[in-house]
């Protein structure tokens, strides 16, 4: 990390193809460091201290770094086969990690020790998770039986997930889940097909447990936005394209539309992202 990185807000991006995580000053977008030694890094999440957790998809484990740090300070071993994403409860510090193949979520109390496992009803594969400001956990997934999107909630203090049927639009493929300050934002990686052969992505603002989609943010010019990050009036999206340009794009939020700016150098399969705010 460059000198001064620990005092700046940082954007972390997992670069799956090169088994590394890149750190940029935010909002400036200047590369300030690189973390290496991963095995398929995917999801990234930050806690209220600014520490980050990185999901090692083929590790399989989840590793923690201090804000701007270069040494691992904790490792949690995932008992499943393929962890994908994570989220930290802002109130308790609990860490939730989704496991793709087992279609469940592991929750580590206070981000320590062994997890408690929660199955996702009706889901064959689990993708992304996100806590809201009340400590309710939302997860999306997919079922091959009906080729359908699955959305579920683990209400704070409850022992099992409840399936939520979203109304107002069809989500074609699970994208990231994040609390945006007002709504539970849910991504659709395959919102619509483009002439270039890729799927333009979108983000839906939902009422969470209420099951209603109230707004849509189209990420114009995208190819496949996997794990976006919302920070204020900006959404940042790693754009993973098998045979195209791999970049990180910035859009206005919740307006969406045209790309405002981009980071284009040094990416090979960018997937996860998170904003880590500098400790006060």
Model-based region annotation:
Residues 1-33:
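An edge-strand/N-cap motif at the start of beta-rich repeat modules
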Residues 1-8, 37-51, 79-94, 121-143, ...:
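Beta-rich, blade/repeat-based domains predominating
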Residues 16, 57-58, 100-101, 142-144, ...:
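Short loop/turn segments immediately following the C-termini of beta-strands
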Residues 20-22, 61-63, 103-106, 146-152, ...:
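Structural motif
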Residues 25-29, 66-70, 109-113, 154-159, ...:
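Short loop/turn segments that connect beta-strands within beta-propeller blades
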Residues 30-36, 71-77, 113-120, 159-168, ...:
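A short beta-strand motif characteristic of beta-propeller blades
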Residues 53-123, 129:
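A generic tandem-repeat structural signature
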Residues 196-204, 208-244:
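Intrinsically disordered, low-complexity segments enriched in Gly and acidic/Ser/Thr residues
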């Amino acid at each position: 990390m460059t000198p001064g990185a620990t005092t700046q807000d940082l954007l972390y991006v997992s670069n799956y193809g090169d088994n590394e995580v890149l750190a940029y000053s935010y909002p400036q977008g200047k590369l300030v460091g690189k973390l290496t030694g991963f095995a398929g890094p995917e999801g990234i999440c930050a806690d209220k201290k600014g520490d980050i957790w990185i999901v090692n998809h083929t590790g399989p484990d989840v590793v923690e770094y201090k804000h701007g740090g270069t040494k691992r300070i904790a490792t949690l071993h995932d008992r499943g086969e393929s962890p994908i994403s994570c989220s930290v409860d802002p109130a308790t510090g609990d860490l939730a990690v989704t496991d793709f193949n087992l279609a469940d979520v592991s929750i580590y109390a206070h981000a320590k020790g062994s997890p408690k496992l929660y199955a996702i009803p009706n889901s064959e594969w689990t993708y992304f998770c996100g806590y809201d400001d009340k400590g309710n956990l939302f997860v999306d997934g997919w079922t091959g039986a009906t080729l359908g999107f699955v959305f579920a909630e683990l209400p704070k203090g409850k022992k099992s997930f409840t399936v939520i049927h979203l109304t107002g639009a069809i989500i074609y493929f699970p994208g990231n889940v994040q609390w945006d300050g007002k709504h539970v934002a849910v991504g659709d990686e395959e919102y619509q097909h483009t002439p270039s052969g890729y799927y333009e992505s979108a983000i839906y603002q939902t009422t969470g447990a209420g099951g209603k989609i109230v707004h849509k943010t189209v990420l114009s010019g995208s190819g496949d936005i996997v794990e976006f990050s919302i920070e204020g009036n900006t959404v940042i999206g790693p754009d993973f394209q098998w045979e195209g340009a791999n970049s990180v794009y910035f859009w206005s939020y919740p307006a969406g539309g045209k790309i405002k700016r981009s980071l284009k150098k040094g990416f090979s399969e960018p997937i996860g992202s998170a904003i880590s705010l500098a400790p006060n």
